[in-house]
């Protein structure tokens, strides 16, 4: 395998991501991992390689305790898979060879692996038995099928949720709330993000310091959005009352799947149930577009009401 700069080969890298089985594709793609590396991760050195069977997307760092380590480009949530390629057996053998030939690491973290997936099985066969193997905490994502369009999606939701959405639609209509899609070119990405931030600043998330109004999380999405716009991936909806934005929902599509990223609403209008209505209108638009699945992201209680499938990945930690 040869060293590479992922940013320089991002389009080819993403094509391989699209063909890689049993991974979180969007969160392994260049838009997600490069933004995370720049905004959320500590300083590290590149450790990415390309070979005949695919890519190894990783970085090398030194822990404060002094030991060197290898980890995926994104490890803020551990969603990104570092082994990218359609031939898991060949790729695992190549990656094992790279790791065995290098003496500049003591611990290697391989995240984003499904426990019974082809990458994990191939690694079990390819890695030297003398290396200690540990399993990290699993990461869960909630995923909803959009099969059957909006009617099919709603039929798989609870009666209580459907009732809440109908009530919210009536309240929003009475309040003069409308919903509109916002597409943007790369040059318009900053303006779109400022519009998103205008809503975010008036949300309960900003008040409690858990949103994206400041700090690394603000930078993360600010770096990601131009890449999404450049490839036509971003999907943003706004809830509006006259000329005022009351709420937004932001996500991205990749290979027939939508990944929800963020949504917020003006806290003064919480009674309208805008969070659920933004989700509903986004699902409606996605169904019309022919998107097959909606990945709501990592574990949160409310997501269980909106999804029926759980994707679980885990972390393999190697110590030598």
Protein language model regions, located:
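Conserved catalytic-core motifs of GNAT/GCN5-like acyltransferases
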Residues: 134-143, 310-320
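Residue-level "edge-of-site" marker
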Residues: 185, 299, 316
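A conserved beta-strand-loop-helix scaffold within acyl/acetyltransferase catalytic domains
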Residues: 2-69, 112-141, 148-271
């Amino acid at each position: 395998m040869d060293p590479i700069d992922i940013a320089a080969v991002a389009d080819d890298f993403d094509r391989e991501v699209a063909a890689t089985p049993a991974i979180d594709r969007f969160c392994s793609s260049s838009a997600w991992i490069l933004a995370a590396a720049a905004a959320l991760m500590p300083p590290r050195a590149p450790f990415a390689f390309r070979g005949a069977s695919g890519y190894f997307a990783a970085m090398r760092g030194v822990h404060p305790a002094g030991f060197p380590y290898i980890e995926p480009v994104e490890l803020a949530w551990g969603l990104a898979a570092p082994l990218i390629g359609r031939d898991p057996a060949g790729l695992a053998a190549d990656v094992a060879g790279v790791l065995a030939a290098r003496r500049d690491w003591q611990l290697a973290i391989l995240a984003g692996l499904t426990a019974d997936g082809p990458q994990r099985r191939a690694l079990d066969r390819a890695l030297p038995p003398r290396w200690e193997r540990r399993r990290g905490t699993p990461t869960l994502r909630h995923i909803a099928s959009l099969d059957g369009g909006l009617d099919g999606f709603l039929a798989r939701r609870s009666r209580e949720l459907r009732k809440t959405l109908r009530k919210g639609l009536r309240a929003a209509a009475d309040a003069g709330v409308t919903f509109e899609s916002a597409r943007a070119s790369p040059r318009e990405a900053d303006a779109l993000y400022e519009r998103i931030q205008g809503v975010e600043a008036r949300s309960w998330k900003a008040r409690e310091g858990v949103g994206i109004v400041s700090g690394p999380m603000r930078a993360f999405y600010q770096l990601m959005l131009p890449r999404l716009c450049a490839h036509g991936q971003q999907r943003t909806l706004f809830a509006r009352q006259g000329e005022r934005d009351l709420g937004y929902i932001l996500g991205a599509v990749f290979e027939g799947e939508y990944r929800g990223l963020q949504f917020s609403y003006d806290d003064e209008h919480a009674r309208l149930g805008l969070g659920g209505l933004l989700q509903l209108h986004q699902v409606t638009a996605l169904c019309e577009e022919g998107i097959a699945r909606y990945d709501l992201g990592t574990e949160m209680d409310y997501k269980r009401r909106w999804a029926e499938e759980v994707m679980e990945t885990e972390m393999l930690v190697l110590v030598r």
